[in-house]
Amino acid sequence: MVRIAVAGAAGRMGRNLVKAAHHNPVAKVAAGSERPESSLVGVDLGELCGEGKFDVVVCDDLAKQIDQFDVIIDFTAPASTLNNLALCQQYGKSIVIGTTGFTEEQREQIDLVAQQVPVVMAPNYSVGVNLVFKLLEKAAKVMGDYCDIEIVEAHHRHKVDAPSGTAIGMGEAIAGAMGNKLSDVAVYAREGITGERTKDEIGFATIRAGDIVGEHTAMFADIGERVEITHKATDRMTFANGAVKAAVWLHEKPAGFYTMTDVLGLNDL
């Protein structure tokens, strides 16, 4: 049984992670945290999520429950995630990271810690999205040299970073398949007189509205035809179940940086 701690357990995603871990037959909800000022610190995690009493309460620092869990699942914010990453480094715990919006320096810090502890990090934990990443690599190799490539993503009004980590992951998959670095070809905003589109650029467009869980489309557009590869999520439990799957897979793995491609065994596709 893999003992799981959920960071940000009282948030929208946190509650789904608690539910997913509770219903996974080889996982156990063993700890959960919230900000110290939260009124939900001390509340039973099961009752918080409508799953009955777990006899595990929300704490304000996972260090206080360090002996209770094996793996942290963290979908919070960069600063909080890095704090939990340091905790894992100190105590030899594993971590599944779903947080997005890291700077390049923060990503380097994660890579460094992954030399000492097992880390799974992915922009999206949906099985479907990770299959899409593979499809995009193949499409880019076939069509990328002569098509205009655009990525459009839509999320709910509360999402604080843009473009989404998944959209960036799509761009990285496409750019990498074409032998490029995304930072060299990405165009994140267009306004005013921009001039004609350049050949190699990958454009991004962002929508924030209502309660959209997550929609992503990559477009390969030529003269006379275009191919669109789309993923639409309708329930956050898709991401939560994938993250718990990753946590179970990661348990007792050696130190290293892993992705959902590793978890799902997609490397040979």
From Swiss-Prot:
UniProt-listed InterPro entries: DapB_C, DapB_N, DapB_N_CS, DHDPR_bac, NAD(P)-bd_dom_sf
Name used for this protein in its record: 4-hydroxy-tetrahydrodipicolinate reductase
Top EC class for this record: oxidoreductase
CDD domains recorded: DHDPR_N
Pfam families: DapB_C (PF05173), DapB_N (PF01113)
Key words of the record: Amino-acid biosynthesis, Cytoplasm, Diaminopimelate biosynthesis, Lysine biosynthesis, NAD, NADP, Oxidoreductase
Listed pathway(s): Amino-acid biosynthesis; L-lysine biosynthesis via DAP pathway; (S)-tetrahydrodipicolinate from L-aspartate: step 4/4
Active site residues according to the UniProt entry: 155, 159
Subcellular location per the Swiss-Prot or TrEMBL entry: Cytoplasm
Annotated residues for binding of NAD(+): 8-13, 34, 98-100, 122-125
SUPFAM superfamilies: Glyceraldehyde-3-phosphate dehydrogenase-like, C-terminal domain, NAD(P)-binding Rossmann-fold domains
Enzyme Commission code: 1.17.1.8
HAMAP family assigned: DapB
GO BP, one annotated term: diaminopimelate biosynthetic process
Gene3D superfamilies attached to this UniProt entry: Dihydrodipicolinate Reductase, domain 2, NAD(P)-binding Rossmann-like Domain
